[in-house]
Amino acid sequence: IFILYYCHKNKVSNLKFLDIVVVGLILAQAIGRWGNFFNQEAYGAITTKQELINMHIPQFIINGMYIDGNYYQPTFLYESILDLLGFVILFLIRCYPYLKIGFLTGLYLIWYGVTRFFVEGMRSDSLMLGPLKMAQVVSIMMIICGIYFCFIRNIKSKKFENLYQEGGIRHEV
Protein backbone atom coordinates (compact mmCIF):
# COMPACT_ATOMS: atom_id res chain seq x y z
CA ILE A 1 0.00 0.00 0.00
CA PHE A 2 2.86 2.37 0.82
CA ILE A 3 4.48 1.70 -2.58
CA LEU A 4 1.23 2.61 -4.34
CA TYR A 5 0.97 5.79 -2.26
CA TYR A 6 4.63 6.72 -2.83
CA CYS A 7 4.42 6.16 -6.58
CA HIS A 8 1.17 8.10 -6.89
CA LYS A 9 2.51 11.00 -4.80
CA ASN A 10 5.75 11.20 -6.81
CA LYS A 11 4.17 10.46 -10.21
CA VAL A 12 6.24 7.31 -10.69
CA SER A 13 5.06 4.20 -12.51
CA ASN A 14 4.33 1.44 -9.98
CA LEU A 15 5.82 -1.21 -12.25
CA LYS A 16 8.90 0.85 -13.03
CA PHE A 17 9.48 1.32 -9.30
CA LEU A 18 8.97 -2.41 -8.66
CA ASP A 19 11.34 -3.30 -11.52
CA ILE A 20 14.06 -1.42 -9.67
CA VAL A 21 13.15 -2.74 -6.20
CA VAL A 22 12.90 -6.47 -7.00
CA VAL A 23 16.63 -6.77 -7.71
CA GLY A 24 17.45 -5.86 -4.11
CA LEU A 25 14.37 -7.61 -2.74
CA ILE A 26 15.44 -11.07 -3.88
CA LEU A 27 18.89 -10.50 -2.38
CA ALA A 28 17.25 -9.48 0.90
CA GLN A 29 15.14 -12.64 0.79
CA ALA A 30 18.27 -14.75 0.26
CA ILE A 31 19.82 -13.20 3.35
CA GLY A 32 16.56 -13.33 5.31
CA ARG A 33 16.25 -17.09 4.83
CA TRP A 34 19.15 -17.47 7.24
CA GLY A 35 16.78 -16.29 9.97
CA ASN A 36 14.97 -19.61 9.50
CA PHE A 37 18.26 -21.36 10.25
CA PHE A 38 18.96 -19.35 13.40
CA ASN A 39 15.36 -19.83 14.61
CA GLN A 40 15.40 -23.53 13.66
CA GLU A 41 12.17 -23.19 11.69
CA ALA A 42 10.93 -23.91 8.16
CA TYR A 43 13.12 -26.97 7.72
CA GLY A 44 12.58 -30.01 5.55
CA ALA A 45 12.05 -33.69 6.14
CA ILE A 46 14.05 -35.81 8.55
CA THR A 47 17.33 -36.99 7.09
CA THR A 48 20.61 -38.46 8.29
CA LYS A 49 23.81 -36.73 9.21
CA GLN A 50 25.63 -38.78 6.58
CA GLU A 51 23.26 -37.59 3.84
CA LEU A 52 23.96 -33.98 4.80
CA ILE A 53 27.71 -34.69 4.81
CA ASN A 54 27.42 -36.34 1.38
CA MET A 55 25.73 -33.17 0.09
CA HIS A 56 28.81 -31.18 1.23
CA ILE A 57 26.74 -29.12 3.66
CA PRO A 58 29.05 -27.15 6.00
CA GLN A 59 29.37 -28.64 9.48
CA PHE A 60 27.89 -25.61 11.28
CA ILE A 61 24.71 -26.00 9.21
CA ILE A 62 24.60 -29.74 9.88
CA ASN A 63 24.88 -28.99 13.60
CA GLY A 64 22.11 -26.39 13.33
CA MET A 65 19.84 -28.85 11.55
CA TYR A 66 19.98 -31.23 14.52
CA ILE A 67 16.63 -30.44 16.14
CA ASP A 68 14.87 -32.48 18.82
CA GLY A 69 17.08 -35.52 18.26
CA ASN A 70 16.82 -35.60 14.44
CA TYR A 71 18.64 -34.13 11.47
CA TYR A 72 16.51 -32.20 8.97
CA GLN A 73 16.93 -31.02 5.39
CA PRO A 74 18.17 -27.39 5.39
CA THR A 75 15.48 -26.00 3.07
CA PHE A 76 16.44 -22.47 4.10
CA LEU A 77 19.83 -23.10 2.45
CA TYR A 78 18.30 -24.39 -0.78
CA GLU A 79 16.01 -21.37 -1.00
CA SER A 80 18.81 -18.96 -0.09
CA ILE A 81 21.05 -20.34 -2.85
CA LEU A 82 18.24 -20.19 -5.42
CA ASP A 83 17.42 -16.62 -4.36
CA LEU A 84 21.09 -15.66 -4.78
CA LEU A 85 21.04 -17.16 -8.27
CA GLY A 86 17.86 -15.19 -9.00
CA PHE A 87 19.58 -12.03 -7.78
CA VAL A 88 22.51 -12.62 -10.15
CA ILE A 89 20.14 -13.11 -13.08
CA LEU A 90 18.07 -10.01 -12.30
CA PHE A 91 21.21 -7.98 -11.61
CA LEU A 92 22.79 -8.94 -14.92
CA ILE A 93 19.76 -8.15 -17.07
CA ARG A 94 18.50 -5.08 -15.20
CA CYS A 95 20.40 -2.61 -17.38
CA TYR A 96 19.57 -4.28 -20.68
CA PRO A 97 18.44 -1.27 -22.72
CA TYR A 98 15.42 -2.95 -24.31
CA LEU A 99 13.40 -4.11 -21.31
CA LYS A 100 9.72 -3.37 -21.14
CA ILE A 101 8.34 -1.95 -17.90
CA GLY A 102 7.18 -4.79 -15.67
CA PHE A 103 9.47 -7.44 -17.17
CA LEU A 104 11.86 -7.61 -14.19
CA THR A 105 8.91 -7.69 -11.80
CA GLY A 106 7.41 -10.54 -13.79
CA LEU A 107 10.70 -12.42 -13.94
CA TYR A 108 11.09 -12.01 -10.18
CA LEU A 109 7.57 -13.34 -9.58
CA ILE A 110 8.22 -16.36 -11.79
CA TRP A 111 11.64 -17.12 -10.28
CA TYR A 112 10.58 -16.67 -6.69
CA GLY A 113 7.27 -18.47 -7.24
CA VAL A 114 8.97 -21.53 -8.76
CA THR A 115 11.64 -21.51 -6.04
CA ARG A 116 9.07 -21.33 -3.24
CA PHE A 117 6.84 -23.95 -4.85
CA PHE A 118 9.58 -26.57 -4.89
CA VAL A 119 11.17 -25.66 -1.56
CA GLU A 120 7.77 -25.68 0.17
CA GLY A 121 7.25 -29.17 -1.22
CA MET A 122 10.25 -30.29 0.87
CA ARG A 123 9.12 -28.61 4.10
CA SER A 124 7.43 -30.60 6.81
CA ASP A 125 5.85 -27.82 8.87
CA SER A 126 3.59 -26.04 6.38
CA LEU A 127 -0.09 -25.07 6.45
CA MET A 128 -2.08 -27.23 4.01
CA LEU A 129 -4.86 -26.16 1.64
CA GLY A 130 -6.24 -29.38 0.18
CA PRO A 131 -3.46 -31.37 -1.51
CA LEU A 132 -1.13 -28.35 -1.71
CA LYS A 133 0.60 -26.32 0.92
CA MET A 134 -0.71 -22.77 1.31
CA ALA A 135 2.65 -21.32 0.23
CA GLN A 136 2.50 -23.44 -2.94
CA VAL A 137 -0.90 -21.99 -3.81
CA VAL A 138 0.52 -18.48 -3.34
CA SER A 139 3.53 -19.50 -5.46
CA ILE A 140 1.25 -20.60 -8.31
CA MET A 141 -0.49 -17.20 -8.18
CA MET A 142 2.91 -15.47 -8.26
CA ILE A 143 3.95 -17.51 -11.31
CA ILE A 144 0.71 -16.65 -13.13
CA CYS A 145 1.15 -12.93 -12.37
CA GLY A 146 4.79 -13.13 -13.45
CA ILE A 147 3.84 -14.72 -16.77
CA TYR A 148 1.33 -11.93 -17.29
CA PHE A 149 3.92 -9.19 -16.62
CA CYS A 150 6.70 -10.84 -18.64
CA PHE A 151 4.80 -11.98 -21.67
CA ILE A 152 1.10 -11.22 -22.06
CA ARG A 153 1.23 -7.59 -20.92
CA ASN A 154 4.50 -6.94 -22.74
CA ILE A 155 3.24 -8.30 -26.06
CA LYS A 156 0.69 -5.47 -26.06
CA SER A 157 3.26 -2.81 -25.11
CA LYS A 158 5.51 -1.45 -27.85
CA LYS A 159 7.53 0.77 -25.50
CA PHE A 160 11.03 -0.19 -24.33
CA GLU A 161 12.62 1.78 -21.53
CA ASN A 162 15.94 1.86 -19.72
CA LEU A 163 15.09 1.79 -16.02
CA TYR A 164 18.27 3.54 -14.95
CA GLN A 165 18.47 6.34 -17.49
CA GLU A 166 18.34 10.02 -16.61
CA GLY A 167 14.76 11.10 -16.00
CA GLY A 168 13.76 7.80 -14.41
CA ILE A 169 12.45 7.78 -10.87
CA ARG A 170 12.58 11.28 -9.43
CA HIS A 171 14.63 11.81 -6.31
CA GLU A 172 13.73 14.82 -4.23
CA VAL A 173 15.89 15.92 -1.35
PLM regions with names:
Residues 1-173:
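A feature for loop-to-transmembrane-helix boundaries and adjacent hydrophobic helices
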